[in-house]
Amino acid sequence: MRCVPVFIILLLLIPSAPSVDAQRKTKDDVPLASFHDNAKRTLKRLWNKRSCCPQEFLCCLYLVK
């Protein structure tokens, strides 16, 4: 039971994470979500261009080359 107060004091001494970014964003900073959105959009566009049948997925692999 002697450890509980020490543990609580240690928790209070640990600094909490800042709620605001410490570094300013530059024009090169892009959120990771936009990369995922761009990848999904590109894959969807390529899938529509290939006009593959979903039953035969291998036909899509041959059209990529």
Swiss-Prot record:
Signal peptide: 1-22
The organism's place on the tree of life at top rank: Eukaryota
GO molecular function (one): toxin activity
Annotated keywords: Cleavage on pair of basic residues, Disulfide bond, Secreted, Signal, Toxin
Source organism: Conus leopardus (Leopard cone)
Tagged with keyword Ligase: no
Family the entry assigns: Belongs to the conotoxin T superfamily.
UniProt tissue specificity: Expressed by the venom duct.
Name recorded for this polypeptide: Conotoxin Lp5.1
UniProt-listed InterPro entries: T-conotoxin
Localization in the cell: Secreted
One Gene Ontology cellular component annotation held by this UniProt entry: extracellular region
Domain free text: The cysteine framework is V (CC-CC).
Tagged with keyword Transcription: no
Propeptide: 23-50
Record PTM: Contains 2 disulfide bonds that can be either 'C1-C3, C2-C4' or 'C1-C4, C2-C3', since these disulfide connectivities have been observed for conotoxins with cysteine framework V (for examples, see AC P0DQQ7 and AC P81755).
